[in-house]
Amino acid sequence: MHEMALCEGIIGIVEEEARKRAFAKVNVVCLEIGALSHVAPEALQFCFEAVAARTIAQGAKLEIVETPGTAWCMACSKSVEIKQRYEPCPSCGGYQLQVTGGEEMRVRELEVD
């Protein structure tokens, strides 16, 4: 379960921001997760509670905003939305797709006291 390691990284980012900006408590952590990132949101929610315990983020709500996968189709020269890798272009049916978005995971916003 790599979600545990991802949550440890998220808490590391939150704690670093707390040191830089001198806030005492995190109420909400908002993440942006791409549809092609291979991250299971349910598992991330579960792991976040465990990793956040006894940190500045203890009790914080984890909000997840899922972003779509996008790709450039070399066959029809269109930017298209895809749900998973290796599926055909929804516009022309071709398989010459280059992923352009949806692989990322980032801390989008923190609500703090």
Curated annotation (Swiss-Prot):
- This one is known as Hydrogenase maturation factor HypA 2
Q: Name one GO molecular function term.
A: zinc ion binding
Residues bound to Zn(2+) are 73, 76, 89, 92
UniProt entry tagged with the keyword Metal-binding = yes
Q: Which domain of life is it from?
A: Bacteria
**Assigned protein family:** Belongs to the HypA/HybF family.
Binding positions (Ni(2+)): 2
Keywords of the record, alphabetical order, are: Metal-binding, Nickel, Zinc
Q: What does this protein do?
A: Involved in the maturation of [NiFe] hydrogenases. Required for nickel insertion into the metal center of the hydrogenase.
Q: Which Pfam families match?
A: HypA
List this protein's GO terms for biological process: protein maturation; protein modification process
Q: Which PROSITE patterns would you find in this protein's record?
A: HYPA (PS01249)
The record ties this protein, via InterPro entries, to: Hydgase_Ni_incorp_HypA/HybF_CS, HypA/HybF
Gene for this chain? hypA2
